[in-house]
Amino acid sequence: MMMATKGKRPLRHLTATDKIDAIQRIHDGESKASVARDIGVPESTLRGWCKNEEKLRYMSRQSAENAEKLTNEATAAALTAVAAAELFNGPPEKRLKLEQGLFGNGKLKYDDSFYKSPRGPMNGLDLSGGDKGLGVSGGDIIMNGLHGADFSSKSKEMNLKGYGADLSKHGDPKQADLSMAAISPLTSLSHLSGMSGLAQSPLALSFNEIATNLNLFAQLNNNHNLATMSNLGGLSAAQSLRNARPKANTSQSPRTSNLSDVNGDKNPSLTVRNLAKLQQKNSGDLSNGMMHGINLSDKYKQQPSAAPLGRDTNAPVDEALWYWLKSQQAMLGLNNLYSSMPRPSSPQQSSSPPQQHQQVQHHPSTQTPTPPIVSTPQPTPPSSAPSLTPEDTKNSSWFWQWYKTFGASLMPGDKSNNNTINANANSKQAAYENILYSQLTKGQNSDSLNNNAQPINLNIISSNGPENVKSEPEDLSNHNHSSSNAAAVAAPAEDLQRFNPSPSTSAKSELKQEDDEEQAGPADDESPMESKCNGKVKDVLDNFLFQNPSSNDRASPANLSIRSNNSPRRRSVSPAVSNHHVNSPEPENGDLAHKSDISEDSNHMLVADIKSSAEAVEHGEKFLKWLEACSDPNVTAMQVMQFKYLLNSIKLSAERQQQNAVSSGEERTRVRRRK
């Protein structure tokens, strides 16, 4: 150790190799302070060495002392060969390397420029291409790894692209196989990893597996043929992708030229979707039976060469999806649903027959298919094979096609395929059972309850006159007196469960109740008078209720139900007491004349029967229970909820009025006591 003057730090003369050893100790995990204390230099100096590590490594290799030291170590054989090459190659070779070392504006890594030449013979990886010789001292080897200065190789590549001479180069994605060009970032890593060929990637995955998986994903994303997934089209497609270096044949020249036309003169930006499009476009030029089987290759050969890169309009149904559907049907026991694979009869057919198309879709539009209502479409016979046309395949997804064919067979009424009349009857009955469907389509036959200003009058005002004339309540929303489609029949007391009236059930119940009522008393001669009075009463009530709303109690739906119960016209009552009214008719025949002369004063008297808001709320709660048990398709759940909120608000106001009355009474008593 050399000591300087007093007061200065002790200085040591360290070689570049010693500095590199110190830096390596830091890389191995030691702290800079401990290393600096060990070698006797300040920590700031060691920190400066770490910043100039690349330069120090280059200087250590240049020194003769380092070369002599490395000759004694068996693990540094590569560095010895490099030092010997530098010592014995002569000045021109050294000047060439120094000039090339300045490439990149001084940012070139010394390690890369120095180690590029010996890595070839050590690892057996040819980085120079097919037309260059491998030599340790050649400057072309160094520049070949950098891909930047030698423009003559670029012109050679452009010439080779036109004639298809060399397709086996690893690092050039323009000339490699399509599957390997799709993963060109991974293939370029093979030069850095030092592994030979494409057998293993730095990601610990086989390049063949990556190429195969990427091809399958490309075909899946592009809605391409998935025969390789289902093994229906053979494994030839996957096997062709596993070949990293395919043999040169006559089909390589047009394939390479098409690829250059698509990508232009620049480097190709190949993605997974572009790969699938290129394979779909150029699959007709491959050898027979190479991709997707013989049938698909014939179909692609019929395409024009200038076809767009999008989806083919005449593409058949995906075979893998067909295989998946068959497996699903096998699990469900529906193997006879399809008799043959749905594909168009001819690939070039422009339009499909309308008869076959109407088996799948029951509307004429093929461009915008709307979801069918569950109860309306005709069921498809299981034995018939539906035809999926090219327009269907192009304009709608495969799952929608599967739903239209497979879901139609699971619809209600599947057992009535032999009789069209029974199927129509079942569909109508199911339409009445579906409340949502009846709500959506009830405006076709009669006006909607929401369009008229009469929300609750449907079940309140029943048939005028004696109870034994008609068993159905009148629908005030329909002014044509035809309420058979919209009104509900009151259920008997034995079964309080909800039921949905269909045309058949309502007709049967109507006939049955008419027979019972005819036994109770004859009233056939009064039906004209009853209909006449019915119209008058309805008009009077309309004018009174919806043109003169004088009070909240008079306009509330709860009070309307009470008026109907207090009036002699009591047909629409709760299911629990409807049987009582049918079996015990009251003598109301003498009141017909009085009812025909009813006026607004009498209506005021009817509403005046309700003494207070609390009584109205009580009757409203009874009517709400009846509404919840009612199964009329014209009464929606939203209307019931609105009536609940209305009744609740009336109840709160009634309680508030009652509290105010009680408080006012207490104040009066207090005032009296004070007096």
Swiss-Prot record:
Q: Which UniProt keywords apply?
A: Developmental protein, DNA-binding, Nucleus, Phosphoprotein, Transcription, Transcription regulation
User: Which GO MF terms does the UniProt record name?
Assistant: DNA binding; DNA-binding transcription factor activity
Residue spans with biased composition (Polar residues)? Answer: 499-508
Biased region (Low complexity) positions are 339-368, 479-493, 559-579
PROSITE patterns recorded:
HTH_PSQ
User: Which PANTHER family does its entry note?
Assistant: PROTEIN DISTAL ANTENNA
Q: State the protein's name.
A: Protein distal antenna
Organism (species): Aedes aegypti (Yellowfever mosquito)
